[in-house]
Amino acid sequence: MELYLDSADINEIKEAFELGFLTGLTTTPTFMHRHGITDIDGTILELAKIVPVLQIEALGETADEIVAEAERQDALGLDRGKTVYKIPISVEGVKACRRLVDMGYMVNIHLVYTLQQAYMAMSAGASYVCPLVGRLQDQGHDALGLVQQCVEAVNYYGYDTRIMFSSVRNVEHVKNALNVGVHTVTVPWKIMKKLTENHFTQIGTDEFFEHTRLMTESVKDVIGANNPVVTSDKSIADALVVMTQGGFGAVTIVDGAQRPIGMFTDGDLRRLISKDGGNVIDKALTDLPMKQPISVEGMELLYTAEALLREKEVDTLVVTEDGKAIGMVDVQDLIKKS
């Protein structure tokens, strides 16, 4: 199934065609007007340099006017083998279609709302017939049934015509296009970008990134520049200042040689206040019971830190280098996405 972009926004057109596999671009005078385009010919020539196939409007009230407009645009320097002229369905439109096809042009008969209209376009040799699914559904019609009938007519009678599913409003419409077997679908960029999205895919991808990170990055890579330490001769108030300034929930208590001898956490503070009241912040850290904190060397992989956190059932490890405290690693540091 051919995949076209439906747009006149030059920036998103450039972005979309970086995908490298889109068939082409469909656009309309309405799109151009919406984006403030006044130099239609200049825009057409610019777009023709970007996209593999360009589908543009050839408007006129009579077959002669439609043919003349297609010839005028062709004379701008467009590649006839890479340009499709869009014509609204009408008696004059299908008459112009036949003449243009005989002259070697490709034609898209669009604004199709009935099978009878599609039949006239196919009979006229239209390269594309384009039912507008979203608009039809807005009016309460069985748009998918119409598209299915158009596909079946092409297949049954052997018309050299591709059915284009257009007026796409959501990702479900693209699924519908695949299910009914259309030859072509044209999709707005905001919807096309959603076609690869899935919640479970994102969960799996995040896990892959997380686990790869654990096996390839060292603990030192994630601890940052802040090193929340206080010496043992300081007070609880001093420890709180360090915790607050660094945005941490804990500080490492070190001796004079920067070796870790304990850890003080916001949880410890809450327990002390609950037990002894607010005056505890003036206490010296040496007055508190201390035990050697669990540490990991900065050169170790995050995988090792994760294993320690699980084994010891703690949320934070002191990070050391040659036995000296250089930072902290928290369980949240291990699940940050790359």
Task: Locate each region found by the language model.
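Glycine-rich phosphate-binding active-site loops on the catalytic face of alpha/beta enzymes
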Residues: P29-M32, L111, Y128-Q139, G181-T201
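Short hydrophobic beta-strand motif reused across regulatory alpha/beta modules
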Residues: G262-G267, D315, T320, I326-L334
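Catalytic cores of alpha/beta
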Residues: E12-L19, A68-A70, A96, Q116-A124, ...
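The conserved cystathionine-beta-synthase
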Residues: V230-G247, V254, I273, I294-D315, ...
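Conserved, mostly hydrophobic/aromatic
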Residues: T28, Y85, A121, A177, ...
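Active-site beta->alpha loop and helix N-cap motifs at the rims of alpha/beta catalytic domains
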Residues: E2-K14, L19-L22, T27-R34, T38-R99, ...
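Alpha-helix-loop-beta-strand connector modules within alpha/beta enzyme cores
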Residues: I44-Q55, V94-Y105, A143-I163, F209-T212
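Bateman (tandem CBS) regulatory domains
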Residues: L78-R80, T216-P228, V280-P293
